Structures are given as C-alpha cells and as structure tokens.
C-alpha cells in the first residue's frame, strides 16, 4: 500500500478547517478587548456547542453501520451515480447524494479525495478531489426534481475537480477495501487507510 507521504496524489487528509466566522471573532478582539473577552467566551461556548451538535447530528442522520466511528477522521468519500446521471456529475463538476446524506457530506473539506461509483456498471471512477466544502443545494438545478422545479433530487453536494484520469476499477479490486453492511452495501464515508488503499490501486491503473 502506498504510504500517504509517498503517494503521487498528495491529498490533504487534514482535520476540518475552522470556519471563517471564528477568524472574524479573533480580529474583533483587537478592536475592543474588554467587550470581546466576554463575547469570545460566550462565542466559544456557543461554537463549541454547535460543533458538538453538528458532529452528533451527522451520526444521527445515518445509521451507525453507514457512518464512520466517532473517533475516525473522514479520509475520503464515495459518491454514487448511474449511467443516466454520471455525465451530469462530470459536466457540472459536482457530485450529489440524496437528502439523508446532507450532514455526512458537510464533513467534506477542500482537497479531500473523492470517488464516483456507477452502480449501473459496478465500476469505481477516480481520482477526484473536493474543490469546495460539502454543502446543501450548491446547485439546486443539478439533477432537478421534475415534480418540484428548483429543487435537486440530490441536494447533498460538493464541487469537484479531476485529480487524475484513471481506468475505472472493477468491484473485485476495490470491494475488499471497503466496509460492508447489510449484504453488498458499502459505507460511503472512508477512513484514511481506506482512502489511501483506493488511491494505491488507482495509482497502479492510471490511464
């Protein structure tokens, strides 16, 4: 397996970045130290609570079998498509999943390795990289719901860029790496060792 530091892909497996709002509070301290000492204390408690609630909410959104353990960092993510939606994924440079994945996808940070699984062909495509933070309805016109115009069928979204064009992987080469639950289903959230193992295989099959 390619070591993280030796991999030619050089992805960032870092912890989620701090929101800009917290940096803004940091600048405000210089303007009014006394006032913001109290505000920062309250803000710290508030932000800490929000971060904690955000983590807890992410694990409540998906059943435990479909989520990484709480003590593991998200090291990569697999998005899912079929023959009908794959070209839209690539053309828009945008990946999306159904609403139940919204909180999970919010854990994605720029630079995280991403992969695209086509369940029509049972192949895994890569290698992609998150070009934005994961969010909700980044482009609501993508995969638009015909019954509800202006709403996406796959609102859990992230912008992507192609890092390296590789031959798609067949199931027998990547499934042993993944965490499975409920028979053939596999977890879309990847831990760091799983992500590096997939990058290892793609490195050997570059187009």
UniProtKB/Swiss-Prot annotation:
**Region annotation Disordered: where it falls in the sequence:** 1-68
Pfam family, any one: Dev_Cell_Death
Q: Which SMART domains match?
A: DCD
Which PROSITE patterns does this chain map to?
DCD (PS51222)
Q: Which residues form the DCD domain?
A: 72-204
Sorted alphabetically, the Gene Ontology BP terms of this entry are:
response to endoplasmic reticulum stress
Provide ranges: composition bias, Low complexity: 8-26, 35-52
Q: Which InterPro entries match?
A: Dev_and_cell_death_domain (IPR013989), NRP-like (IPR044832)
Signal peptide (UniProt feature, chain positions): none
List the protein's name: B2 protein
